[in-house]
Structure formats: structure tokens, C-alpha cells
């Protein structure tokens, strides 16, 4: 006897979806579902052996399809194909499935045939099914007993049917309704399968790195399938016996038509179809082979990206493919200008891994976190059929290569800044007396030097000298002129230089006119490019120091002497720095350098005092500092006149001989080398060579000043005679200095530096261990 029985619609409007006959169950999905192919359902008695032995009645289970679990198909043909693949018959897209009472048959096998279905429609529908979505398996099931419908061996491969202990517990859950198991109430049994679903483009909110196949249907209604090729390889294999049944990739799902018109799906013997399982939640979940419904977007494609890759596209966040979360595992982003993926109708869509397009600049990389990817800078990319963008332009077609004119601020030529006076910061009128000054400071300095004024500061010699307040304190203004380097001799020297250049130019022009064959003009005297020793001495000359003497307090010998000692200590320090800068001096032995400084410190201070007094006060006053000038009134103080008389002698001799600045620098250097120990220096030969060098420099300075060779030797004799006389002046000054240093009753303070020098020098002078280097014999 044939175990199959046709499933035909009833002739009455029966809302029940379950019809029971003697040898099997006939399932009717309402009247409104008719109009398509007829489903033949046969029930095998061996499929549910355990259930038939326990109860002779039919146990009814509800089929619950959560809302949103199946995507809405817009075409009626596609909906029919979906219904056929699931073993159901649906007439319209908006048709509702009434699943109040779905019973399990006692025997027979379920088979599927489509004798009245259009073959061409089936081929197109099955091809579309490969891109559609189906119901995933509930991850919360714990491998309880599952019922698999086994069709004929020629049509479908066999599936396994296991009945666990949980299914045996269903007997205890039967109510009074004929022993049937009711999992849901009547109002919960009606639901929509193909409803217009609005799938969100975002992730359903599942945990990261969780398989989309394990989505909870009861919690997330929008969760569908995800591409199997995008997941790990474990999803492509057959699950273990203890794991849930996962959809498999069929090698060939193209339908085959037998001679009698039945539809046959070919598959290998070792591949099992998805099973209809009974879960812990006591509902039946239908699982079909994993397919993906791929939406047809205009020119936007999906691109796979592994963690660490950089994808620069229109969207930087993970998207969901038709409602499936892609936040776990691989991520799919919208990208631009990627190749379209060629798909076959009998295969599932495979998302190939496409390398990301290199980004445009390193700055974008650093902002987006480029990882360890090696990127190519924008401008070197060359994609066929794609416009190459250059740096700085959005598109060559939108903005041609036009050289933008430079900004007016960068090209605007501003004139040179006005030159300022080095004394009062007013606008300078030129270089006066060797310094860039204004006309007012020029006249002031000339009158101050020639008028022999004795300026005294009413403050602390730190008055502000500017354009407005330059007339408030002449003493500070005069001090600032000296600090700037103003010198009356600079004007005369400049005139001589200009006169010499004019004479040389005139001589060259005359020679050129006499010899017209000469095309190259060579000056008679080429300027010396190598700096002379005199020019170096001018550079290293120490600045004028201030004593810090308060002129508002009544003068006294003790206060003046103490101030002079403090000033002398700072001048000694400046003299040490100056000596080390003299060319050749540092080549001497270190002990020789210290010895020469200890013997000559008073020579240097006295000669510099005479020069300042000669240049600033015409040798009538002693200009120790701009703020400490000893006039005739101060010279009359006790113990002051005799010492001032010796110092005025030096100033008067310089004034009488009209010593030039170059001559003064050479003479000052020779005074550093004017005294040595009787035993000689450790580097005596080098010392003699250095001393002879500066004697020759003094002769050059004399020739430069006089110009007439007949008077050069005479002037050299006068200047060297002055150097010899300095020994007597310094000897008198040292005797008075030693006396005040040893006499504690005078209470004259000495700075530490000066006290150390005097302490080391006293034994040498007392023993007579000093040799004077004189130019002339007495």
C-alpha cells in the first residue's frame, strides 16, 4: 500500500491548519494559500518511533516563525520559490501562515514534487534563493532531539533523526486537549512570514566575533544570515555531533528534473541537509542551506578588511548585509571604485578580500591610525579609467594647473628699517666719530670733549637715555657715548682713509690714460685682506667700567680710595680677559702668563687712566670712570695729590705727543710685556719674539700717523721714552698701594682679586726679583 497521500484542500472554510486521516496527517495551510503547486506529504512511521510507542494520539507542535526572520520578497515568483524550498505553499506575498495545529505523523516520509510548477520559474527561483535569506539556527539549543524528514533516496539525501530525553518529557506537558502539546496560545500562533521588513543598516547588536549563525531569534528579530566565505573556516565544515546543526555549502544546488516531472536536488552522500530540530524553548526552527540575499546597490560594493588594514571610503563603520551584523570577524565597508564581484547563479556570493586603496597623505594616516601598512602617497597612484588627483587640487578637471600669484604681503618690498642712534635711539643721521649716531648726540659729544665739562650724575649713574630724556643727565649721556665707542680721532682717520683712496684712484686713472693698451685696471695699493694686529687689538679692547660712586654724598679720602680699589679689582679682571685675547699671549706658558699679569696690572690701569683723561678731559682731570672723575677739588684731599700728580703726568705726556689710538694700543700691549722676573720666563724665547712683533707694530702705527719717514724715528724715540717713564710712575703707585694694603688703620677695603695679586707681588718687589725691560739706558 502506498505510504503517500495527497494533500488536497478541503471544501469548507476550515480555519484549522491540521487535517487528520487514518494513516497519516494532511497539513492544510488555509484556503487562501491555494493556487499553486500541490505538496505531497508522506509520514514515515520509523521517523518518530519513540513518539508512536508512548502515545497513540498525534502530538501537535507549533511552528513559530519570529517576525523579521525572513526577508520580504517584492516579486510573487520569488515568494513562491521561497515557500517551495521551505516545504510550504504560499499564494501571495502578503499571505499569512496559520500554524495553530501542526501535528507529527506516525509514519511515512516527506517528499516534494512540483509537477504543476513551471520549470523555468523554478530555475529562476532557485537561483534567486541563493541570494535570499533563510531562518538561522537558534544558538541556545543544547543538541536536544531533532526530527529530520527523510525523503526518498533518489530525491534527497538521508538525514538523521535523534529523539532525546527532552522530547520524552513532552508527554508530561500534554493538557486536556486530546493529549496534544500546546507550546503557544491561539493568539500567538498567527504571525507573518513575508512582511515588509525594514532592516537596519547597522549591526543587530550582537557580541563581537560571534557567528551570525548563532543569532537569537527570540531576542533580535532582524538577524539573518551572513556570508559564509567572510567567516572563519570552521563555519564551512560540518559540525560535530554535540554541536548545533549549521548550514552547509552545497557543491551544486541546481535542480534536476526527472522524466516524470519530479524535482530532484543532487548532493553528495556525505553532505547532510539542515535539520528540523526541537530546541529547549520547545519550538521547531526550520533551517535551510545558508544563502545570502544580496541587495543590488547602484555602484557601491562591499570590500573585506581584516584588522589592521586601512580602508578609506565613504563609511568607516561596519555595516550589516541585509540585517546581519558584521562587527565580528571580518568587517565590510563601503568603498569606492572597486571591481564588481562576478557571481554564478548556482553559487553563494563570495566576498573576496580586496586590498585597500592607498590613502592620500601621511597626515590622514596618522589621524585614522594606519597601523603597519605601507601606503603610497597620493599622486603616484595610477588606476586605469580613473582620474589621478594631484596634491593640492580636488580634481584636475575642476581646477586646471594655474600658478597662483604670490601673496602681496610676501612680495611687497618694504624699505630698510630706519637706522637708530646708538646713544638715544633716535633716527641716526650718519656715522659720527666712528659710531652711528644722531646729529644731537654728535654735537653733544664734541662739546663734552672739547669743553672739558665735569658732568656728575644726580642719581646712580643708570639714568635712561632716550630721545625724550637725553638732556636730563649729561653725565649718563656722555657715559653712553663712550660706551658706544665715540672717538674724536675716528673722524680724522676716516678723512685720511678717504683721501688715500682718492689718491690711489687718481694714480690708477693716470696710468690707464698713459697706457691705453692696458685693459685691466689694477690699483696701485691693494687693500690688505688679512687683519692686522692693530685691528685685532681694537676689537678686544675692554669697555669702560663704572665705579658706582655716589656724588651726592660728601667726598672723603677713605671713600674715594675704597671706590677706586673696587673699580681696580673689576678692571684687573677685564685686563686678564683682554690679555688672553691678545694674539700670541696664550702661546706662552701658563705660569708666564700669570707672572706677566701680576707684574703689569698697575701699568695697564695707569696707562688706560691717562688715555681716558687725555681723550675726555684734555689731561686736566683724572677720569677713572664716567661716574668718578677726580677734579682739582678732590685732589686736595689728604693723601690724594701726590698720587694724582703721577697719574696726571701720563695724561699730560699723551696729550703733548698727541698719541693716536693705534699707537696707544701698541704701547699698552708693550707695557704688558715690560717686566719679567730676573731668572727669566719659562718660554723666554717665545716671549721675546712676541714682544719684538708688537714693537714693529708700534713702528707701523707711527708710519701710518706721520707718513714722513724723516720724523718716524724721532717719534718712535719719544713714545718709547714714555714707556720707560711708566716704570717710575708705577713704582710710586705700587708703593702707596702696598702701604694702604698693609696699614690696617686706614681701613681701606681691597677686593679679593686685587688682594690676592698684591699678596703674591709683595715678596717679589721686596726681594728685587723684577727685571725692567727698558728701551733706553739712563
Swiss-Prot record:
Q: Where is this cross-link: Glycyl lysine isopeptide (Lys-Gly) (interchain with G-Cter in ubiquitin)?
A: 419
Q: What induces it?
A: Binding activity reduced by FKBP5.
User: Where, per the database record, does this protein carry Omega-N-methylarginine?
Assistant: 23
Effect ascribed to mutating residue 120 to L? No effect on nuclear translocation or transactivation
Q: Which residues carry this modification: Phosphoserine?
A: 45, 113, 134, 141, 203, 211, 226, 267, 404
- Start and end residues of each stretch annotated as Interaction with CLOCK: 485-778
GO molecular function list: DNA-binding transcription factor activity; nuclear glucocorticoid receptor activity; nuclear receptor activity; sequence-specific DNA binding; steroid binding; steroid hormone binding; zinc ion binding
Q: What outcome is documented for mutating residue 762 to I in this protein?
A: No effect on nuclear translocation
Outline the segment boundaries, as ranges, of region: Hinge: 487-524
Region Interaction with CRY1, as annotated, extends over 533-698
- State its role: Receptor for glucocorticoids (GC). Has a dual mode of action: as a transcription factor that binds to glucocorticoid response elements (GRE), both for nuclear and mitochondrial DNA, and as a modulator of other transcription factors. Affects inflammatory responses, cellular proliferation and differentiation in target tissues. Involved in chromatin remodeling. Plays a role in rapid mRNA degradation by binding to the 5' UTR of target mRNAs and interacting with PNRC2 in a ligand-dependent manner which recruits the RNA helicase UPF1 and the mRNA-decapping enzyme DCP1A, leading to RNA decay.
Family named by the database record: Belongs to the nuclear hormone receptor family. NR3 subfamily.
Task: Give the protein name, as stated in the record.
Answer: Glucocorticoid receptor
Say which species the protein is native to. Answer: Saimiri sciureus (Common squirrel monkey)
Q: Which gene encodes it?
A: NR3C1
